[in-house]
């Protein structure tokens, strides 16, 4: 957990309007996004929350714990990944927005990296750029 927090600190150095929460990092219980967002919203009820995910994750979002509650708690920002079908993404977008989710899909630069890739690079002292 401390490695993930350190990676975030490095990635966000000099960036304003970002804050790191360790709610999930040091918990002994399984972490669920709906629980984490509940805690964040309770502690900071006037803040807006944005959940950045790979667009491929939209497909599986309905399977997440307490999905219908979760989609009311934040705005999702879906980032396309190379090799992922835009048609599948559009179908997933249509499904989750019909269910009530707010999803931003913009012209973000494609990012061919996952959290698994970042952890591997960090643990092996490899350079992570941009």
What is the role of each PLM region?
Residues 1-130:
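Nucleotidyltransferase catalytic core that binds NTPs
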């Amino acid at each position: 957990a401390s490695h993930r927090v350190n990676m975030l600190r490095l990635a966000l150095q000099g960036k304003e309007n970002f804050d790191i929460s360790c709610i999930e990092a040091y918990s002994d219980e399984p972490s669920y996004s709906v629980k984490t967002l509940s805690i964040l919203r309770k502690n900071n009820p006037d803040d807006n929350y944005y959940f950045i995910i790979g667009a491929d994750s939209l497909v599986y979002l309905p399977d997440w714990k307490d999905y219908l509650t979760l989609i009311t708690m934040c705005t999702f920002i879906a980032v396309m990944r190379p090799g992922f079908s835009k048609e599948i993404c559009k179908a997933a977008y249509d499904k989750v927005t019909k269910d009530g989710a707010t999803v931003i899909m913009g012209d973000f630069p494609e990012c061919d990296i996952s959290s698994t890739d970042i952890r591997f690079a960090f643990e092996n002292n490899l350079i992570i750029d941009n």
